[in-house]
Structures are given as structure tokens and as C-alpha cells.
Design a protein with these regions (language model features):
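The canonical Cys-X-X-Cys-His
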Residues: 58-64, 121, 158-167, 222
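Sequence context surrounding c-type heme c attachment/ligation sites in exported
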Residues: 51-55, 59, 151-162, 174-189
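N-terminal export/targeting leaders of redox proteins
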Residues: 1-44, 89, 228-230
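Electrostatic cytochrome c docking/interface patches
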Residues: 22-54, 67-72, 127-154
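Periodic glycine anchor positions in long extracellular repeat architectures
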Residues: 63-66, 78, 166, 181
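Axial heme c-ligation environment in periplasmic c-type cytochrome domains
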Residues: 69-77, 91-135, 173-178, 196-229
Length: 230
């Protein structure tokens, strides 16, 4: 009996020594946690109402989310809410007062909209993400546009566009519009309208005075460059 116990203890001791001499194993890696899904933005009641209005009134020209696919029609997605509201208000004629901004199409489209409707539409488009326009590829023109955007043209008294619209074209929502990613054809048309005086709803005539100093080539260059900004 004693011999059997001694033998069993000897075997156990040998087993423990053998395990002690084995190299340590690295712990099994923990399962990688799945990345949390991106939170869906919560839209205000105004924006939700604006979505419904935009679907029936604006989508044909500007698309339901405001990302225009027609070069001459502006992209409204991501534009400043206050700026969109101002433009819609300017398109609408009041009693005994003509519209501050002229466009046969837009003047007619805003006619049935109330002030609250226009605020809601502005809230909807401002809440959307801009999908940038197809970038221009004329490197020489883009270089000229970049120079104007960043530094202006001192000899002609043209200030840098970035001074008001930002280095990346995001603008200042309550004052200056987003031009980064905007349709180049639309920006070009508006600068020419300011230059000709056909558009005159700019504060203190700032855009009219600047555009009046710009050549067609400069307008084209800066419009193409702005469309490429991200």
C-alpha cells in the first residue's frame, strides 16, 4: 500500500515538473468588438416638415437632398440655413413690393410658401451633407483660381475669396454662403449676374463691387476652383 502511494506521488511530481518546464502560452486574443453603428442625425421638426415640402416643390431641380445634378442649378445641401432662408425670402414678392431677387422660376416656386415653410425648407437642406460636384480638370485654370481664392488680385483690388468664404469654401452660415463643392456653372452665372447688376441682393453691394473687377477668365477660374474645394 505504502509502495503504491509512493509511486503515485512520484508520478504526480514528475507531471508537475514537466508542465512547469513548458513555455508559457500567450493568452487568446479577445474577440474584436464590433464598431458601433454611426448614429443617425436627429432632425428637428422644422427640418422634417421642410423635407416634405422640398419633396414636392424643390426636388425636381435640386434633388430631394439638395445635391443638384444639373450644373446650372445650385446645390443646397449643407448650405447655411440663414442664407437659404434669406434667398427664398428675397425671391418672394410682398404686397406692393417686388422680389429682391429676380428669377421667373424661383419667384413662382416660392409664391405659395409661407414664411414658416421657407424656414423649414432651409432647415432641411442645411441638415443635409453636400456631395461635391464633379471636379474640373484644367490644371492651369485651377491654379489661377486657387491664387484668386487665397490671395485675390491686389493690382485690380480683388480681395481673397477665402477672407469671407473660408479656406475650404465652407463660408459663414449666417453671412456668407458655402461655395466649396458648389456647381461651377452656377457660381459662374451668379458672379456674372452680380457684375452686370442683374443680381443685387448682396449686402452693401460687396459682391457687385468685387465681380465688377473680374474678367470672364477670372470668374471661370475661381468658380472651377471653388467646386473642387472639400
Amino acid at each position: 500500500m505504502i509502495r503504491r502511494m509512493a509511486l503515485a506521488l512520484a508520478i504526480l511530481a514528475a507531471s508537475l515538473v514537466a508542465h512547469a518546464n513548458e513555455p508559457a502560452k500567450a493568452p487568446e486574443p479577445a474577440a474584436t468588438a464590433a464598431a458601433p453603428a454611426a448614429a443617425t442625425p436627429v432632425l428637428s421638426a422644422d427640418a422634417l416638415k421642410g423635407q416634405q415640402i422640398a419633396a414636392g416643390v424643390c426636388a425636381a431641380c435640386h434633388m430631394p437632398d439638395g445635391n443638384s445634378v444639373i450644373p446650372i442649378n445650385p446645390t443646397l445641401a449643407g448650405q447655411g440655413q440663414a442664407y437659404i432662408y434669406k434667398q427664398l425670402s428675397n425671391f418672394k414678392a410682398a404686397e406692393n413690393k417686388p422680389a429682391a431677387r429676380n428669377s421667373p422660376i424661383m419667384n413662382a416656386m416660392v409664391m405659395p410658401l409661407s414664411d414658416e415653410d421657407m424656414k423649414s425648407v432651409a432647415a432641411w437642406f442645411a441638415s443635409q451633407t453636400v456631395k461635391h460636384a464633379t471636379p474640373a480638370k484644367d490644371e492651369k485654370l485651377l491654379a489661377a483660381g486657387q491664387k484668386l481664392w487665397r490671395a485675390g488680385n491686389f493690382s485690380k483690388g480683388i480681395p481673397a475669396c477665402a477672407g469671407c468664404h473660408g479656406a475650404n469654401g465652407a463660408g459663414l452660415p449666417a453671412q456668407y454662403p458655402r461655395l466649396g463643392g458648389q456647381q461651377a456653372d452656377y457660381t459662374e452665372a451668379q458672379l456674372k449676374a452680380f457684375r452686370a447688376g442683374d443680381r443685387n441682393n448682396d449686402a452693401e453691394k460687396v459682391m457687385r463691387m468685387i465681380a465688377a473687377k473680374m474678367s470672364d477668365t477670372e470668374i471661370k477660374a475661381v468658380s472651377d476652383y471653388a467646386a473642387n474645394l472639400r
